[in-house]
Amino acid sequence: MKKNFYTISKTMSRSLKLILFSVFIGFSIFLIPQPTWAYPFWAQQKFENPREATGKIVCANCHVASMPTRAEVPQAVAADSVFKTVVEIPYKKDLQEIGADGSKVPLQVGAVVMLPDGFKLAPQERWTDEIKEETQGVYFTQYSEEQENIILVGPLPGDQNREIVFPVLSPDPRKDSNYNFGKYSIHVGGNRGRGQVYPTGEKSNNNLFTATNSGTITSIETNEDGSQIINLNNEEGESFTENLPAGTSLLIKEGDTIEKGAKLTEDPNVGGFGQLDKEIVLQSKARVIGMIIFFIGVGLSQIMLVLKKKQVEKVQAAEGI
């Protein structure tokens, strides 16, 4: 009996510790923001598929500013082969942005590559020395346990990772009938810098703020955390407040009269998100060999026809025709 009681107590103690640890981790995620959780944590939590029916990648919901992203993908690849998908995220050198605490910080970058079904991140034992060198310091994750064809990277220091190499393994339709040879689409997204909107819909301090009310600014208060409160009075004597996060640069001052919609701050954003689509052909070796044989056959046939024609011309010339 004592033994059973001890076993039950020990089990309950372990369960309680596990629950407390889980709660601690959960609160840590929300109360202690970390750069590595900034992307793509929210997209993974909110969206089963990162690409909407319209074709828009959901990262653009928070990173509303647009900037170009480029990608290099082979035109065709063989089955069960490793190839590189290179995502380029260009921006000006030494560019800095406003961090969540209002301080200036270097830009970070991130990328997502949505591969066709069957394509996935190549296992490390199949990486070449060149790929190992090009991916040093880069950590790859898949969007979910079930979607190994969607690969994510970031956030990473932008000054060192303006070009991100994704090592990809193609499927082999000869071994798995679920996949076929043919042409497929690859969807690529690349981002530099923080988002302008939080997943909750609220603006981040990396955004332009406008007045929600008209009136005269009576005072501007600055809190300990750097956030600011703009106090206004309108012509009817009503009082309003505008709350601004830390790090914003004001365009207004005490005593100014502003209209609803007027700019209160400068637009601090220097980053942006971009996406594009690429095509790739999963090539069958048998088809390639068959095509080569076909072209050789056609070429030989043409040569034989030319030789035959010359032979006929010689015979006709000899007979005086």
Swiss-Prot record:
GO terms for biological process: photosynthesis. The chain crosses the membrane at residues 288-308. Its cofactor is heme. GO terms for cellular component: plasma membrane-derived thylakoid membrane. It comes from the Bacteria. It holds the Pfam family Apocytochr_F_C. Binds 1 heme group covalently. GO terms for molecular function: electron transfer activity; heme binding; iron ion binding. It is a single-pass membrane protein. PROSITE patterns: CYTF. InterPro entries: Cyt-f_TM (IPR024058), Cyt_f (IPR002325), Cyt_f_lg_dom (IPR024094), Cyt_f_lg_dom_sf (IPR036826), Rudment_hybrid_motif (IPR011054). Heme binds at residues 39, 59, 62-63. Keywords: Electron transport, Heme, Iron, Membrane, Metal-binding, Photosynthesis, Signal, Thylakoid, Transmembrane, Transmembrane helix, Transport. It is found in: Cellular thylakoid membrane. Residues 1-38 form the signal peptide. Component of the cytochrome b6-f complex, which mediates electron transfer between photosystem II (PSII) and photosystem I (PSI), cyclic electron flow around PSI, and state transitions. Belongs to the cytochrome f family. The 4 large subunits of the cytochrome b6-f complex are cytochrome b6, subunit IV (17 kDa polypeptide, PetD), cytochrome f and the Rieske protein, while the 4 small subunits are PetG, PetL, PetM and PetN. The complex functions as a dimer. This is Cytochrome f.
